[in-house]
């Protein structure tokens, strides 16, 4: 089951803020008036630690005290509102659950996603309210895929609107040009061999990627639609991406993955910061 945390956070912020606001407008004034009446009934209550002050405090708690729900709303609303703003418009943390982006990202990596790199969007509705930039080839991007529109995915931008993307014999072509590949190592992995290399998309400094010899990849050629992006995982033979479920609409973009800040694979392991750093 996918938990829509942004929706829950928005509901909690609006609920706590609404309770605090309604209390301030409708009920808080009555409690203040009652406390003033009680102050007249306890002369000397302004003297700290006096009997009158203690009796006055007890009476206020009993007859003019702030309801618990209002107290909680007043305490939590500012904190939750700050969290909502940070997660919605600045940076949001995510955990990597699969190996589709190996070797760039490993299972258990905790990453930060820049939420304003491609424009500011309202939480839940995903409506863009301010243009700031657009995805570029080579960006590692978080988004909602067309076949699971409530699940976060992370892949690399391979094609922009209008690009022709081809894949033949595990070789990538962009706009008819062969994407340079430099193979760095071959590593045995059980019954197959993993080839790790570096790939240089047009206009980028290159990134790590890997394939294996278990099976042949399906050849294809496609033109990226207007307002869409073609996404692929760096673990080319172990990634469900645009080759399977199609292109990603601009409206379903979440943000740009910019850094790893921690690695923690499971509750049985020890958190590590050795992989902390920028995402290439």
Please tell me what each predicted stretch does.
Residues 2-31, 38-39, 45-69, 94-95, ...:
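Soluble "head" domains of membrane/secretory-pathway proteins
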Residues 66-95, 116:
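Transmembrane alpha-helices and immediately adjacent membrane-cytoplasm interface residues
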């Amino acid at each position: 089951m996918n938990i829509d945390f942004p929706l829950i956070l928005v509901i909690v912020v609006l609920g706590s803020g609404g309770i605090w606001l309604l209390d301030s407008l409708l009920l808080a004034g009555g409690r203040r008036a009652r406390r003033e009446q009680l102050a007249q009934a306890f002369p000397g209550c302004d003297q700290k630690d006096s009997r009158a002050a203690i009796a006055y405090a007890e009476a206020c708690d009993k007859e003019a005290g702030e309801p618990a729900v209002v107290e909680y709303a007043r305490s939590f609303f500012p904190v939750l509102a700050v969290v909502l703003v940070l997660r919605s418009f600045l940076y949001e943390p995510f955990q990597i659950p699969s190996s589709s982006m190996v070797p760039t990202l490993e299972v258990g990596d905790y990453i930060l996603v820049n939420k304003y790199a491609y424009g500011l969007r309202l939480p839940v509705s995903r409506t863009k309210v301010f243009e700031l930039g657009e995805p570029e080839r080579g960006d590692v991007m978080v988004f909602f895929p067309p076949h699971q529109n409530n699940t976060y995915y992370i892949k690399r931008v391979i094609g922009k609107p209008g690009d022709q993307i081809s894949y033949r014999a595990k070789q990538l072509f962009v706009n008819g040009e062969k994407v340079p590949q430099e193979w760095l190592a071959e590593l045995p992995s059980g019954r197959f061999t993993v080839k790790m290399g570096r790939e240089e998309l047009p206009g980028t400094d290159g990134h790590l990627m890997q394939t294996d010899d278990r099976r042949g990849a399906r050849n294809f050629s496609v033109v990226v639609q207007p307002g869409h992006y073609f996404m692929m995982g760096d673990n080319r033979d172990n990634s469900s991406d645009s080759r399977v479920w199609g292109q990603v609409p601009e409206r379903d973009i979440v943000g740009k993955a910019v850094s790893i800040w921690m690695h923690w694979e499971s509750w049985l392991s020890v958190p590590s910061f050795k992989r902390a750093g920028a995402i290439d």
